Structure formats: structure tokens, C-alpha cells
From Swiss-Prot:
Enzyme nomenclature, EC number: 2.7.7.18
MF (Gene Ontology): ATP binding; nicotinamide-nucleotide adenylyltransferase activity; nicotinate-nucleotide adenylyltransferase activity
Reactions catalysed, as given in the entry: nicotinate beta-D-ribonucleotide + ATP + H(+) = deamido-NAD(+) + diphosphate
InterPro entries, sorted: Cyt_trans-like, NadD/NMNAT, Rossmann-like_a/b/a_fold
Organism: Gloeobacter violaceus (strain ATCC 29082 / PCC 7421)
Protein name from the UniProt record: Probable nicotinate-nucleotide adenylyltransferase
Enzyme class: transferase
Keyword Zinc appears in the UniProt entry: no
NCBIfam families tied to this protein: cyt_tran_rel, nicotinate (nicotinamide) nucleotide adenylyltransferase, PRK00071.1-3
Family, as annotated: Belongs to the NadD family.
Keyword annotations of the record: ATP-binding, NAD, Nucleotide-binding, Nucleotidyltransferase, Pyridine nucleotide biosynthesis, Transferase
SUPFAM superfamilies reported in the protein's UniProt record: Nucleotidylyl transferase
Gene: nadD
């Protein structure tokens, strides 16, 4: 039996404390041996908001997970050209870890979009889906999961009692509006990096 590995894909623009809480919860509650953080160079399903290059986003993730047990950075998406399709990500990781059991972290709000992902019928049955609640995500997740299970043979592992209202969008909005308090939403080393690099219109070196 191979390792139980998690895939945590995203733009991480920027990575925040909510991302870390989500990864820790998935690792601990689902008994994962390791979670691979996979920053997307070019997300296929939504435009990438401005503020940080893929190099900066990779470095922020590296800083955020430094010293975290059972977490590692993967560059399979960052290093390849074109859209970061999930099926391509999974196939590359399967080549690197041929004996692994795969678990994909998915925000609850992504359930409705999952059937529209590139080559969804091939992708969905190939891993288990750890579904993380998101505030205000609307539709009943139980019904959505039941429909996807019937249609694609999906296997879901809900983190039903997880709560976190931090999002990268919220962080960027606070930064754009010049509101104080955004630093508390991010790991300290990521805050320092943003100041050092002058990302998200923060004055460099401030």
C-alpha cells in the first residue's frame, strides 16, 4: 500500500493562514502522509488576479510551509507552459509517486464547477476529493456530491466541521483599499516577503 498523498493546488495569491489551516485539517483528519502544495502558473478556470508572479507565489508557499510536518512544495505546474489543468498535474504526480493514493483538496464552492474541468470524466475517479467548507458557498454540498458520485464514481471526504473565512481575494481587497489588518491574515514570513518585494502595491522595504 502506497503513501496517502494530498494535492493542494491553487494560485496562492497570496498564501494565507486559511490555506495552512485547511492543509493541516486535511492532513490530520484524513491521515495523509504528506500534502503537496502545487502553485498554478496559469489557472485554467479563472483569470489570475494581479499582484505576484509565479516565482513570487512559489516562494511565498515555500516560506509558509517551512517547518510544517507532512507538507512539501511541488513545481509540476509552475514549471510547465500553458494552463495548469488538474488532470495533467495528477498524471505528472502519478509518474513521480506511482504507488501513492491520491487525495485532492477542493473548496466546497468548487463542486459545481468540477464537472466542467478539463477531462473531468478521467480526472474525478482517479483520486479522493477532500471537500472543505467555504462560507457563503450556497448550494447543498451533499446533493452536489451525490450527483457527482452517481455521474463519475467520485469519492468524497468532507471536512464538515472545518471553518475559515479567509480568502486571497479578501487579502488583496484589503491591500488595494489600504486597510490595516491584512498582515494578521498571513504567515509572518509571507508578510515580510511581501514588504521586501513590494508586492500588491505595498511599498518595497516598508
Amino acid at each position: 500500500m502506497g503513501e496517502r498523498l494530498g494535492i493542494f493546488g491553487g494560485t496562492f495569491n497570496p498564501v494565507h493562514r486559511g490555506h495552512l489551516a485547511m492543509a493541516r485539517a486535511a492532513r490530520d483528519r484524513c491521515g495523509l502522509d504528506q500534502i503537496l502544495w502545487v502553485p498554478a502558473a496559469q489557472p485554467p478556470h479563472k483569470p489570475l488576479a494581479g499582484g505576484a508572479s509565479i516565482g513570487d507565489r512559489v516562494e511565498m508557499v515555500r516560506l509558509a510551509i517551512a517547518g510544517e510536518a507532512g507538507m512539501a512544495l511541488s513545481l509540476v505546474d509552475a514549471r510547465r507552459p500553458g494552463p495548469s489543468y488538474a488532470i495533467d498535474t495528477l498524471r505528472l504526480l502519478e509518474e513521480q509517486y506511482p504507488q501513492a493514493q491520491w487525495h485532492w483538496l477542493l473548496g466546497q464552492d468548487g463542486l459545481a464547477d468540477l464537472p466542467g474541468w478539463y477531462r473531468a470524466a478521467e480526472l474525478i475517479p482517479r483520486c479522493r476529493w477532500i471537500v472543505v467548507p467555504r462560507p457563503g458557498s450556497g448550494a447543498d454540498p451533499k446533493q452536489a456530491m451525490a450527483d457527482l458520485t452517481e455521474r463519475f464514481g467520485a469519492v468524497f471526504v468532507p471536512l464538515s466541521d472545518f471553518e475559515c473565512d479567509i480568502s486571497s481575494t479578501r487579502v488583496r481587497e484589503q491591500l488595494a483599499a489600504g486597510r490595516a489588518g491584512w498582515e494578521a491574515l498571513l504567515p509572518e514570513q509571507v508578510v515580510s516577503y511581501i514588504h521586501k518585494r513590494g508586492l500588491y502595491d505595498v511599498p518595497a522595504g516598508a
